[in-house]
């Protein structure tokens, strides 16, 4: 959950390899990690005080991208996307984190192959056709 939020705050793609980060991206990621974790620690302390949370969950309605698949990104309004791998899921904003490009997960992109949308605009156009 927090990794999705940290990467969104740092404006980094969830598939970017750490060995390819520039020095500036490393600093940005470090600050985003500190800021995001500090913010959530404070929020959770305010909610629970000295007690233990009633419900332990990774899905919180006020998160920017985690658990918000297909909902609008609070920063740019683009539809939050996800990558599913085995039992794990990563949520990201294609516009804020990936220059508007959609990332392919193993299951759906293999099924769709050539029909997999390349960017957010292509996906939105297809969704509009389905709705009509």
Residue ranges of each PLM-predicted region?
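Basic, nucleic-acid-binding surfaces and adjacent catalytic neighborhoods in DNA/RNA-processing proteins
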Residues: 1-132
């Amino acid at each position: 959950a927090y990794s999705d939020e940290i990467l969104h705050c740092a404006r980094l793609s969830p598939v970017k390899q750490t060995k390819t980060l520039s020095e500036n991206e490393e600093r940005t990621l470090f600050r985003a990690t500190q800021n995001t974790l500090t913010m959530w620690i404070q929020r959770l302390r305010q909610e629970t005080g000295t007690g233990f949370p009633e419900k332990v969950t990774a899905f919180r309605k006020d998160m920017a991208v985690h658990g918000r698949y297909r909902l609008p990104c609070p920063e740019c309004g683009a539809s939050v996307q996800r990558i599913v791998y085995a039992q794990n899921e990563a949520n990201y904003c294609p516009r804020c984190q990936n220059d508007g490009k959609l990332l392919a997960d193993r299951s759906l992109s293999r099924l769709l192959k050539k029909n997999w949308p390349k960017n957010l605009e292509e996906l939105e156009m297809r969704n509009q056709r389905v709705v009509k």
